């Protein structure tokens, strides 16, 4: 995939030199990526040119680098609740050091056969993993404040612990949508969504008869509290 947008979820990438290659998003907002799987890339799972990724539930397997920052470009990266396996060169390759825009945060990242967690391209420094299997409770590189009254300084915070067991797969952070053939469109049931018509009765009847109700974009006017039964879902897409 070339040049991502601002949000990506529930996707899988197999093979290729890279799973994702991307430059800055438009209009320069961060990129949120949730519930992704990468396997067998020849160079890196993700190659970023100043994107500013925020990543949750990223499973990477059998590739030299999980995340690579483009040469001579500072970048921001936050990775949380992820699993990296068989990463031969480095979990993260940091391109630029000592730059205010270089920010790296890893939180609760499980690693299996990842001998180098972070490699710094400029200095050649490497942060080694603690064992064959380990958990990164916290890793931070960038400007760090001890408290609000102190000046910031470039620091590296590393809290890694060896573990005896790691998960084989990751569960999903986002709920799985019900099958689309089970959806009922609230507009087909008579809702207007024009900001003026009172759609309360349509919604009340819909939730009493259906479990999965799709609500297209609009301004739906409700004048009473809508009470949902257990398992009833209102589905909106952006």
Where do the model's predicted regions map?
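Extracellular "leader-to-stem" segments immediately downstream of a signal peptide or signal-anchor
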Residues: 1, 6-10, 14-15, 22-40, ...
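N-terminal extracellular ligand-recognition/capping segment immediately after the signal peptide
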Residues: 200-238
